[in-house]
Regions:
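Aromatic-Pro/Gly-enriched surface loop or interdomain linker
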Residues: 23-89, 93-96
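Hydrophobic h-region of N-terminal signal peptides that target proteins for export
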Residues: 18-22
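Glycine-rich, histidine-containing beta strand-loop boundary motifs that form or position
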Residues: 12, 121-122, 152
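Structured segments of extracytoplasmic/periplasmic soluble domains
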Residues: 61-69, 93, 110-114, 138-145
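N-terminal secretory signal peptides and thylakoid transit peptides that target proteins
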Residues: 1-16
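Extracytoplasmic/secreted proteins, especially bacterial periplasmic and envelope-associated proteins
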Residues: 53-57, 61, 103, 107, ...
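Short alpha-beta junction capping motif
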Residues: 38, 89-132
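An acidic, glycine-rich "communication" segment
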Residues: 125-192
Length: 192
């Protein structure tokens, strides 16, 4: 069973456990038929190839806690590559400047407006850092100044598989600079 992007998102935000009761067959895995592919997006500006552990941690967790047929390999596609438009899940990360070229911008907008899910990871962990500010500026220029909104702790993403009362709590600052900045919320652009 290959999932469309919309089906994957519905499962992610609306009850992954119950929807994936039927386990994968060995032949399906052997043939390379997967329900989930992890796609990392590379972009021309900044440093897209950071935090090598995150993809493997997510992939391992999906294999361990779900019965989805999960491709164990991370796939890397350029944001300018039209094949990224077919991926049900994309990951974009970095520490530095995010400034999409015209093709990257068009693909990002088309992907999101058509229901794509992009997990964006600020590897600086700095609320006021270059990655956060430049990514938010890109989103404002593409989707409008008020497009990025804080997710309430009651959002379905916090109760889709495990139940959380909000984003992961930390007992220490995340950026290591002594300014006590911690992420108390997640942000999203929700295209209806």
């Amino acid at each position: 069973m290959n999932l469309t992007r919309a089906q994957f998102l519905r499962l992610l935000t609306g009850g992954l456990a119950g929807a994936m009761l039927a386990g994968p067959t060995r032949s399906a895995r052997a043939a390379g038929h997967y329900d989930f592919h992890f796609t990392r997006l590379k972009y021309d500006s900044g440093d897209w190839d950071v935090d090598a552990r995150m993809p493997s941690n997510l992939i391992t967790s999906l294999i361990d806690y779900t019965t989805m047929r999960v491709d164990p390999k991370e796939h890397v596609l350029a944001l300018s590559d039209p094949r990224m438009l077919a991926a049900p899940f994309c990951y974009l990360a970095g520490h530095k400047l995010v400034e999409f070229n015209p093709v990257e911008r068009r693909h990002f907008e088309r992907y999101v407006r058509n229901g794509g899910f992009v997990f964006v990871d600020d590897c600086n962990h700095d609320i006021d850092g270059l990655f956060a500010k430049s990514f938010e500026a890109q989103m404002a220029s593409i989707f409008g100044a008020k497009a990025m909104k804080k997710l309430p702790n009651t959002h379905a993403i916090y109760s889709s598989f495990f139940t959380f009362d909000g984003p992961p709590a930390t007992s220490f600052e995340l950026n290591g600079w002594g300014d006590d900045l911690v992420h108390e919320y997640l942000q999203a652009i929700d295209i209806k």
